């Protein structure tokens, strides 16, 4: 008996659909799962995603800023994490509730920027302190970077256990 279940959509299949929806509608809402953005975003909230800002010749500084929450494709899932670094044409993101950053991604993997979060129909993010909080998370990335580097170097010197 043949199964009638459809195979799940892959990122290659749904990312263009989401980009098209963003271009057509200007925004979309997406349910957020997981704890990687705690304490900033509550578990099982709904995020509002808008297109990335496009720098124009007359406004060259209008671009995505460090500390912005972005949505990107990682494998076959959507991830909402904070942009903490741009390096060598790639972007590095990190969840506020994570100790280490994500692997670098190509800018083409980034689908949009999070503009708001809702829980129970009420807006829960951003709040008045978000501009200061944004810089706290970016600073944390840079302050912990030498510690992570040293930790990995020392672990490499120990050899296999």
Task: List each language-model region with its residue ranges.
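Extended hydrophobic leader/signal-anchor segments used for secretion and membrane insertion
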Residues: 1-161
């Amino acid at each position: 008996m043949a199964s009638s279940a459809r195979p799940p959509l892959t990122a290659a299949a749904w990312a263009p659909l989401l980009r098209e929806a963003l271009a057509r509608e200007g925004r979309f809402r997406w349910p957020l799962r997981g704890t990687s953005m705690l304490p900033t975003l509550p578990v099982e909230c709904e995020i509002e995603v808008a297109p990335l800002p496009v720098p124009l010749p007359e406004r060259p500084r209008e671009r995505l800023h460090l500390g912005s929450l972005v949505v990107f494709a990682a494998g076959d899932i959507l991830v909402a994490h904070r942009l903490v670094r741009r390096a060598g044409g790639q972007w590095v993101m990190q969840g506020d509730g994570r100790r280490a950053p994500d692997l670098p991604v190509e800018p083409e993997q980034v689908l949009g920027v999070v503009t708001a979060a809702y829980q129970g129909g009420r807006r829960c993010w951003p709040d008045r302190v978000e501009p200061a909080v944004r810089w706290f998370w970016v600073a944390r990335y840079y302050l912990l970077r030498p510690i992570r580097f040293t930790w990995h170097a020392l672990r490499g010197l120990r050899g296999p256990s």
